[in-house]
């Protein structure tokens, strides 16, 4: 079945521009990783889904499949999700070998089925990293990220009461860089894409968005030392600067944050040794 969706765009001249977006239904074959728990060996199982709308999100397609499995008396596929609008970072999975699927700067919940075509075979599996053990099926334990944040990814000094806007002057470039780094949603795509399972982009983003602002300055040195120490303790790998993390980050976090992190860590280490 083929239909058309109307998209209206306004311009400064108040004229309407209309785009016709074709939408259609498709039949797909899914190869999904099923694993009962961390100790289970796990493996792929194949499912056929029919009449999937091109305008469904990837997770909505999973909802349809799970409803069918439940009606058949089978156990539904376990997958993580919450906001379904690209904010929480919960819907983390490989889709055809790519974190979050084929679209760039996009989370799984924002991926629509028009990214695929009728008859496609789609392979879905959980993050593969020592620090992200599988809980069940496509759900992994990402609490290692939480422990890194608990080690120093916050501001604990008393910053006083809320003040008027612009009371603390901040250079525009620093404000822009901090804002861009703060876009990190902690989904773990950077770790999943890295051949070494490094978490430096995640840590770098957190260190940058706090350390660049005046409120985060007092704890700047202890923050980076403690967060790196916890990252190493969790078993994440080293960074070899391949750039795979930036390429797959759904929020486009730049690897310049890793360079900034290395600088911060070196300076903090020198001071701590004195």
Regions found by a protein language model. Name each.
Residues 10-14, 18:
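Intrinsic disorder/low-complexity segments
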Residues 26-46:
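Eukaryote-biased recognition of intrinsically disordered, low-complexity regulatory segments
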Residues 33, 50, 95-97:
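Short strand-turn-strand beta-turns centered on an Asx-Gly dipeptide
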Residues 56-75, 122-274:
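Ferredoxin-type iron-sulfur electron-transfer modules in oxidoreductases and energy-metabolism complexes
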Residues 95-119, 124:
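Glycine-rich phosphate/adenylate-binding loop and adjacent beta-alpha elements
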Residues 45-56:
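Short, contiguous acidic and Ser/Thr-rich linear segments
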């Amino acid at each position: 079945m083929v239909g058309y969706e109307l998209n209206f765009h306004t311009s400064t001249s108040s004229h309407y521009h209309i785009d016709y977006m074709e939408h259609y239904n498709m039949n797909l074959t899914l190869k999904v990783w099923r694993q009962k728990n961390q100790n289970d060996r796990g493996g792929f199982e194949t499912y056929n889904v029919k009449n999937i709308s091109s305008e469904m999100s990837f997770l909505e397609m999973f909802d349809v499949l799970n409803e069918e499995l439940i009606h058949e008396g089978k156990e539904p596929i376990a997958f993580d999700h919450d906001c379904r609008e690209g904010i929480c970072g919960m819907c983390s999975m490989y889709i055809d070998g790519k974190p979050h699927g084929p679209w760039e700067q996009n989370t799984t919940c924002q991926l629509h089925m028009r990214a695929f075509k009728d008859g496609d075979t789609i392979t879905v599996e959980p993050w593969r990293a020592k620090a992200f053990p599988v809980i069940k099926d496509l759900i992994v334990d990402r609490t290692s990220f939480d422990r890194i944040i608990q080690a120093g990814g916050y501001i604990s000094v008393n910053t006083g009461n809320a003040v008027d806007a612009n009371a603390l002057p901040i250079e525009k470039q620093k404000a822009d860089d901090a804002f861009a780094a703060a876009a990190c949603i902690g989904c773990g795509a950077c770790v999943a894409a890295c051949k070494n399972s490094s978490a430096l982009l995640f840590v770098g983003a957190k260190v940058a968005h706090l350390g660049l602002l005046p409120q985060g300055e007092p704890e700047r040195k202890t923050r980076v030392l403690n967060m790196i120490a916890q990252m190493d303790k969790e078993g994440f790998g080293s960074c070899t600067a391949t750039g795979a993390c930036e390429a797959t980050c759904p929020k486009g976090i730049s690897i310049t944050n890793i360079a900034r992190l290395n600088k911060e860590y070196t300076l903090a280490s020198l001071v701590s040794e004195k």
